[in-house]
Amino acid sequence: MSPQTETKAGVGFKAGVKEYKLTYYTPEYETKDTDILAAFRVTPQPGVPPEERGAAVAAESSTGTWTTVWTDGLTSLDRYKGRCYHIEPVPGEEEQFIAYVAYPLDLFEEGSVTNMFTSIVGNVFGFKALRALRLEDLRIPVAYVKTFQGPPHGIQVERDKLNKYGRPLLGCTIKPKLGLSAKNYGRAVYECLRGGLDFTKDDENVNSQPFMRWRDRFLFCAEAIYKSQAETGEIKGHYLNATAGTCEDMMKRAVFARELEVPIVMHDYLTGGFTANTTLSHYCRDNGLLLHIHRAMHAVIDRQKNHGMHFRVLAKALRMSGGDHIHSGTVVGKLEGERDITLGFVDLLRDDYIEKDRSRGIYFTQDWVSLPGVLPVASRGIHVWHMPALTEIFGDDSVLQFGGGTLGHPWGNAPGAVANRVALEACVKARNEGRDLAREGGEIIREACKWSP
């Protein structure tokens, strides 16, 4: 090796491990409007300073690796690196802190939730220097939001398609979710829709099993929709689950649903994947189908307090990827704090502009500009006696999704649907008359019982 080569190597590159904070911890950094901002809850290994761990998260989720590499000199690290720009303690948790990281927009492919998550959470969660890591929130800049189509139609267009205004929509998941033949399944759909529901729903794990192949289910459910519409004069729908083992089979099911002229299909967006979901969302926009989203598998990701990802992040990702409805759980019977957190991400689904509000778990102000909103679906163990609370908490722009609360009626499926519809209309009427649903809810439902099975 010549002396000249040795000199260049010595000046331009020095191998070895160095502290992340020397490069990736930048408390003086002023965030840009185009940066994607992330709030991580970090639980480090003992003895590691917060600045080093916050910088490690920024490095390992952007341009960094465990050592200096000679190709660092071939690019502009300052332009592309993630930066940990702020660290704050978690109240009541001595060993945890929130690390705020800013990512330059050029790190991400336009219109790809898949790439965004691969970059931000794809690798760093296995980092052994951390005991636990949780992504609490993301700020998606307007410049990146505008690269996404978002929901196929959104709240207002859905109401126009259904010609239903001024109240929450009503749905029911058909039970038992597995084991029914296609014909008996279609019968239950018809009875619920005829009784007064707006939608019925495939359960998330109803795909195309030996006891009920997807094409048979689609045909019998379409027949139930046609018949109930003719008898009630209302537009009805059934969430036909298009989720499949391949994207090709998923699209085949969506195409068949369009040929049947039904209004809505369904997708399990976490198990199906964001690439598949975005593909289906684009098809639904182009072909006039509404898209209902189920969040099956979400608790694997969001249930642990210290590790994983909060559902508000998954909700934001869904709004970008595309869906007209998504299950948001229900706050009935929950603690007040949980209610505030839930309604925080419900607002992130529906509203155009949401201010930072840490009391509701919103770490960043989020501007969705022209991206359509998503209807939150309140489900899980609800029945008619919850209707006053649900109407008050979720408001008109929501779907109230029953199951046993409809099908468990002692007189049958249709009377159960009638009871749901009568209870909802009684609550909406009482609210519009100025009555206090929280205080008078029980009385309102008892009055409605006179006109309901």
UniProtKB/Swiss-Prot annotation:
InterPro entries: RuBisCO, RuBisCo_large_chain_AS, RuBisCO_lsu_C, RuBisCO_lsu_C_sf, RuBisCO_lsu_fd_N, RuBisCO_lsu_N_sf, RuBisCO_lsuI. The disulfide bond which can form in the large chain dimeric partners within the hexadecamer appears to be associated with oxidative stress and protein turnover. Its main location: plastid. Its EC number is 4.1.1.39. Residues 1-2 form a propeptide. It catalyses: 2 (2R)-3-phosphoglycerate + 2 H(+) = D-ribulose 1,5-bisphosphate + CO2 + H2O; D-ribulose 1,5-bisphosphate + O2 = 2-phosphoglycolate + (2R)-3-phosphoglycerate + 2 H(+). It is an enzyme of class 4 (lyase). Substrate binds at N123, T173, K177, R295, H327, S379. It comes from the Eukaryota. Its cofactor is Mg(2+). The active site is at K175, H294. Heterohexadecamer of 8 large chains and 8 small chains; disulfide-linked. The disulfide link is formed within the large subunit homodimers. The basic functional RuBisCO is composed of a large chain homodimer in a 'head-to-tail' conformation. In form I RuBisCO this homodimer is arranged in a barrel-like tetramer with the small subunits forming a tetrameric 'cap' on each end of the 'barrel'. This is Ribulose bisphosphate carboxylase large chain. It comes from Sherardia arvensis. The gene is rbcL.
